[in-house]
């Protein structure tokens, strides 16, 4: 039934719960940007430093959360934060601090979610900065050094400006990702029991739109989210495009934080620069660098260690106080029970089918489409490309309800096909492959055509081998995202025989 503007009227003027969840979402978004991005930048500088020992090991440690299922990560963090047997409260007890109800208290619940978000996203964000650092011309640092620039000035006037495009991309990605936060909150609070003081706007949209079958009202929330995300992106684009004048460079930020950043910049110098002026001796700087990275790395590893050790503990050992770090009698029955009491083998098989199908179809169609956009001229090419790029700016929760209705009308509810088709050939994948294929010399393609090669043969035997790094990158990203997908399977799957492993884990923990 057509309701005109009724859904928006109720949303904006009569629904106080919506505004409470909106404030929570703004907190998650702002916290993600202000905490994750600076931390990821410092981490990237450290991982790029020649002074860092065991660099491959630390890169593996910090990047591991990227490939960890959000369900597994959230369940582990939930146990670490438990107010009765959690490891965090145990550590605070040595400082004389009483146990904190991290998830139940309104003053700490959002910070608990932020712990999970920062742990999961910092490694991925640092990858972008680390990649950007590799493309900075090292002669810029040498020229700055000759001019007498300190480490701080090299960082402020060389590194940051050169990283501006990457920083813009990261800010937009982190803002959009945190604004549509769902899995972190949903799993931490056992599904539908999310308290109002921790609810995100997507959790609220899920409850009202899907569970209460108010699809029109849920769609109005999606439209509001799209406007907010577009507004945030435009502000960031405008702020990065504006020039920084001299007064801004002498802001209170610089006057107060110059000594701190100068200290950090001397510990984390650019990889190829030799800075003459060093407040710290090289030996002290190297020791501090390695100690700090080791501490952060160990903190990052705590959820993994707790996850693996808990798999071999009994329920009594998991809930023991003080916490039992390692079981003296490993309980291997936990693993066998997973496959005897639950159809875990079917869930894993379903995840493999879905992940491989989505990956293969995505790589095939994205590479073909990227080849067409990069090497062919046809009518409305620019318009189609811009429209495609525009769709990549629309987060999934915004189209979730219309897609749910469409899949239902196509008869694909509660099926693996319904998990596969919506995620084949995403716009960001087409854009990525277009960028890789654009670097292929046109002369090779023209020479192959002159020899009588067909278009598909040119694509398969010339283009594909040359863009194999791009294909590998797209394959890894797509497979990991598909394997860890949780929100969409949660919406359309009902029969546990069709569950993926991420959704099945919630069944094991009775979420």
Write out the residue ranges for each language-model feature.
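A structural signal for multi-pass alpha-helical bundles of membrane permease subunits
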Residues: 1-249, 281, 285-511
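Membrane-interfacial, low-structure loops and terminal tails that flank and connect transmembrane helices
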Residues: 249-280
């Amino acid at each position: 039934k057509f309701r005109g503007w009724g859904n928006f009227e109720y949303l904006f003027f009569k629904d106080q719960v919506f505004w409470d969840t909106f404030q929570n979402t703004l907190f998650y978004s702002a916290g993600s940007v202000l905490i994750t991005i600076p931390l990821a930048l410092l981490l990237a500088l450290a991982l790029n430093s020649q002074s860092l020992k065991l660099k491959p090991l630390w890169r593996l440690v910090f990047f591991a959360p990227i490939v960890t299922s959000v369900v597994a990560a959230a369940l582990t963090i939930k146990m670490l934060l438990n107010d009765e047997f959690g490891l965090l409260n145990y550590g605070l007890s040595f400082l004389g601090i009483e146990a904190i109800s991290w998830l139940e208290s309104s003053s700490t619940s959002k910070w608990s979610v932020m712990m999970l978000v920062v742990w999961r996203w910092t490694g991925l964000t640092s990858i972008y900065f680390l990649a950007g650092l590799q493309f900075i011309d090292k002669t810029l640092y040498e020229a700055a050094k000759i001019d007498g620039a300190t480490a701080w000035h090299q960082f402020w006037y060389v590194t940051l400006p050169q990283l501006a495009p990457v920083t813009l991309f990261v800010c937009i990605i982190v803002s959009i990702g945190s604004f549509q936060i769902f899995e972190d909150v949903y799993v931490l609070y056992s599904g539908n029991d999310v308290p109002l003081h921790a609810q995100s706007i997507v959790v609220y949209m899920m409850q009202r739109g899907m569970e209460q079958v108010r699809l029109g009202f849920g769609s109005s929330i999606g439209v509001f989210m799209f406007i907010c995300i577009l507004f945030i992106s435009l502000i960031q684009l405008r702020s990065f495009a504006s020039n920084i004048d001299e007064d801004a460079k002498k802001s209170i930020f610089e006057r107060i934080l110059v000594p701190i950043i100068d200290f950090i910049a001397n510990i984390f110098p650019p990889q190829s620069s030799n800075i003459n002026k060093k407040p710290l001796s090289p030996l002290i700087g190297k020791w501090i660098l390695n100690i700090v990275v080791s501490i952060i790395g160990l903190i990052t590893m705590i959820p993994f260690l707790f996850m693996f050790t808990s798999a071999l503990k009994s329920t009594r050992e998991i809930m023991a106080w003080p916490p039992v770090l390692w079981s003296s009698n490993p309980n291997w029955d936990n693993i066998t029970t997973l496959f005897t009491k639950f159809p875990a083998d079917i869930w894993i098989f379903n995840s493999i089918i879905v992940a491989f199908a989505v990956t293969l179809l995505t790589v095939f169609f994205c590479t073909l489409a990227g080849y067409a956009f990069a090497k062919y001229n046809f009518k409305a090419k620019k318009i189609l490309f811009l429209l495609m790029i525009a769709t990549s700016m629309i987060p999934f929760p915004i189209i979730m309800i219309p897609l749910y209705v469409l899949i239902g009308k196509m008869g694909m509810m509660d099926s693996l096909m319904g998990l596969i088709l919506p995620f084949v050939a995403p716009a960001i994948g087409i854009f990525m492959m277009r960028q890789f294929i654009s670097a292929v010399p046109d002369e090779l393609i023209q020479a192959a055509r002159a020899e009588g090669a067909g278009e598909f043969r040119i694509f398969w035997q010339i283009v594909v081998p040359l863009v194999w790094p791009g294909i590998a990158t797209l394959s890894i990203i797509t497979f990991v995202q598909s394997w860890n997908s949780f929100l969409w399977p949660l919406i359309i799957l009902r029969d546990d025989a069709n569950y993926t492993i991420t959704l099945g884990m919630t069944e094991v923990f009775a979420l």
